[in-house]
Amino acid sequence: MKKKDNGKRVRFFIVYLLIYSYCMKKLKIGFTYDAKADYKLKPGESPDKIAEFDSEETLSEIEYSLKTSGHIIERIGNVHSLLKKVAQGKRWDLVFNIAEGIKGRNRESQVPAILELFDIPYSGSDALTMGATLDKAVAKIIVSNSGILTPKFLEIEDLSQLNKKKFHLKYPVIVKPSEEGTSKGIAQESIAHDFEHVRKRTKWLIEKYKQPALIEEFIIGSEFTVAVIENDPPLVLPPVQIAINNKTFLGENFYKHSCVFDDSIKYICPAEIPKSLDKKLRETSYNSYKALGIRDLGRFDFRVDKDNNPYFLECNPLPNLGLIDVFPLVSKAIGITYEEVICKILNSAIKRYGLDYTDF
């Protein structure tokens, strides 16, 4: 009798699963991105141009994670591919966007602007926020007006604006492109201790990147990055401390893109820091997220001085989501998988639009 009852229960459970699978709501999710393989550098072009773009390995990791949500995932590709598909009448319930764009200071705004134009929901921040955060000077002004500490700075569009007598920043300073990410244009030579070095580096940056140079007081100390996801309320993930050559007090050293390739960089999460500093970093990240109008995900970079004061450096609303970056570390620190973090970002956007779906 027991065997018959068990058999009935198994059959009932199988039928239940089949009915549930048939009835549950699945969304059609588009996936926009910039792949390194889609762009061929012309002779003389710097690898910097595609430094922010993703490898096929990273794209596959994200795509797999999105598929674990149970929704239907369709690769779209870059902004040009998106335009073609939209012109052909293609539509999606929502687009998961990590596209960086290829040209101009509004490049990160291109995909969000197109999707808004065609009334297609998408993950991440809108075009206005993308533009504001790509311009480091604008982002610093916004957070500063919200009471958040950020190093004093100058933005120089033309070398004639640099005047030794009127130069009020304290040395050392760091000179970097105002409208770039992935540490483009930043090297140890970016640190300057005198005006002539500032002038030389500023001239080089303006000529190479065809954009303003940001000259900023350099905070001697340690370096952190903090990821934030979701919206109501935002979920601030554990701070990640950056160690270079096994040192957490970096002095005048700092994160550079070259560190990734020479294996000198190490991410420490959870960071081995006082609770008071952990709290400051989380609160400052939360407040920056709100002040800049970030949605669904963002990452914030800080320098921390000898008195444990965190200084906002920049915000990346399109942080690298691959396994080589900080997201696997922070997901492990809060007891969830990398795939679950990606799905949290997706579900955050879905809920923000009030889309009808089944939360798997």
Describe these PLM feature segments.
Residues 2-4:
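Polybasic, lysine-rich low-complexity intrinsically disordered segments
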Residues 7-8, 13, 19-122, 128, ...:
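ATP-binding N-terminal substructure of ATP-dependent carboxylate-amine bond-forming enzymes
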Residues 22, 27-32, 87-89, 131-214, ...:
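Active-site nucleotide/adenylate-binding loops and adjacent lid/helix of ATP-dependent enzymes
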Residues 38-42, 181-183, 324:
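Short acidic/His/Gly/Ser-rich catalytic and metal-binding motifs that mark active-site loops
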Residues 73, 121-122, 150, 173, ...:
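Hydrophobic beta-strand scaffold residues
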Residues 95, 195-276, 280-283, 306-311:
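Phosphate-binding site of ATP-dependent enzymes
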Residues 144-147, 274-360:
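ATP-dependent carboxylate activation and anion-phosphoryl transfer catalytic cores
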